[in-house]
Amino acid sequence: MGRRRQVSDQQISIAAREVFLDRGPKAPVAMVAKKLGVSTATLFQRTGSKQQLMLMALQPEVTAITELDRGIQLDVPVREQLARILVELNDYLGMLIGGSITLRAAQIEAELPDPTPSKCRALLADWLTAASAAMLLRVADAITTADVLIGTLESRHIHAYMQQVQLSSKQHRDYIRAMLDVVFPAFG
């Protein structure tokens, strides 16, 4: 019978993500091990290499389209639906952007996970088209609107990363609601 794991893969991912996003790709694995209360050897035994640890930690584990997959919900206000969709996309894009920048700085090539930002844009455009067809929302150009909404979220994450600023979930939610009021003034 093998020894019980001291820490889960999820705990390793979270700790490594925090260390590498905060300290950059040159942060030693020993910092992650210390944060977890395990030895560096234990981490290498579990992940194989620093590169594998970084890949494990810096690629999103969740999908960005759970809310989009629900489709249009006639019993939920459209502003609420769109806000939930954008909060979910924002969380996903934040992980993807921070992770991608850090992996690139470490010269680690990694494929973008599915859904890619382009696919997220296309799915959001489809949702906006459906909301417009159901007369829940006025959208002149769903593709451009999706690009504006997602592009704004991406740029906010890039700016926060470059300024080394951590934004809270509440700050993101408040920003998304304010952005919706600007893009769709009829909501306000």
Enumerate the language-model features and the residues they cover.
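Amphipathic, non-transmembrane alpha-helical scaffold segments
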Residues: 5, 9, 58, 113-121
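Amphipathic alpha-helical packing segments from all-alpha helical-bundle domains
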Residues: 95, 109-134, 143-147, 158, ...
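Hydrophobic alpha-helical connector segments
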Residues: 67-95, 145-149, 176
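Amphipathic alpha-helical segments used for helix-helix packing
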Residues: 52-58, 90-111, 158-162
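Amphipathic C-terminal alpha-helical segment
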Residues: 91-95, 126, 130, 146-168, ...
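Basic, helix-initiating cap at the start of DNA-binding domains
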Residues: 1-35, 41, 51-55, 67
